[in-house]
Amino acid sequence: MSNAGSGRRLFGAIFWSVLIVTAFPLASEAQYKGDDIPGFLGLQSGTQAPPGIYVGNVVWVYPTSTIKDNSGHAINLPGSLTSTAEIILLNVVTNYKLFGGNIGGSDGFPFIKNRIELNSLDVNTPFAYTDMFLGASLGWSLKRADIMAGYNLYIPTGRFSQGANDNTGLGQWGNEFTIGSTVYPDQKKLWNVAATFALEFHTDKSGTNINVGDMGTVQGGVGRTFYKKVSGPIPMIMNLGVAGYAQFKVTGDSGSDIPPALRGYKDRVFGLGPEFNIYIPKPRLSLLVRYEPEFGARLRTQGQTVVFSIGWVAKSLVKQPH
């Protein structure tokens, strides 16, 4: 693999590597949240990093003052809410292969303030440890495309008590399967188009007969890569483009602890906005900023997603050609 090619994969995928891997007062069509918070993936979301050990930190900020009903109309509720999360991430991509793809694994150790469990602005929790996750992935690098498949396990390590407004976790186990691809339309791979689809399933919430509906999440974007020559074999690599997401319930919430009139509804939301990220080779650092205002929400909050991240290549495991 050329140094530029290795750097491009590193730059485009380090954000996946550091990510891979979240009592409704209004008695109207309440929807429970799943574990996957949209907005954590964007440009080149379907690309796995080159073999290596990666450490990262992600900050997610979500301000909102709007809740939409099933027709898309804003529900008149007072107040506003800002949910904030910080996630420490560890990712390893190995040279071991399965079905021709590199095997990788990730851990996420998240902290959150004001965790949203239902579509309510009545949330007041301190910055505290929330539900962690473990991930596994397989990645393939083709001539004009990358492919990645994965599995994420969400573990209910946060505090949870049914009906409380100070929960830091969701009280449920989550199983998520992902498949994504990054396609390069031009021969020089300056342009990239990416999308990753995730399907999430949940156990009943602890101590309840409430099962959050199966959830689908699509994240990706369209971007342009720019290179700047610096000292050393790998250039500085910048990526600028538009990132977006769609999240929707595939099945409605169910269980005997949910009133019959509130069962079966399916929420949705979309987000779209700019992303810029840069890989600086000498300190082996990647920096990212992403802003995605939401629209088209149904039965959930509609706000603004802001993501900042930093990733560090702790050790490269790329095999050098002889």
What are these regions (language model features)?
Residues 39-41, 53-55, 59, 84-90, ...:
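Hydrophobic, lipid-facing positions within transmembrane beta-strands of outer-membrane proteins
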Residues 45-52, 94-104, 141-148, 185-191, ...:
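Short loop/turn motifs that connect adjacent beta-strands in outer-membrane beta-barrel proteins
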Residues 68, 74, 208-322:
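Outer membrane beta-barrel transmembrane domains
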Residues 104-105, 110-213, 262-267, 281:
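Outer-membrane pore/translocation modules
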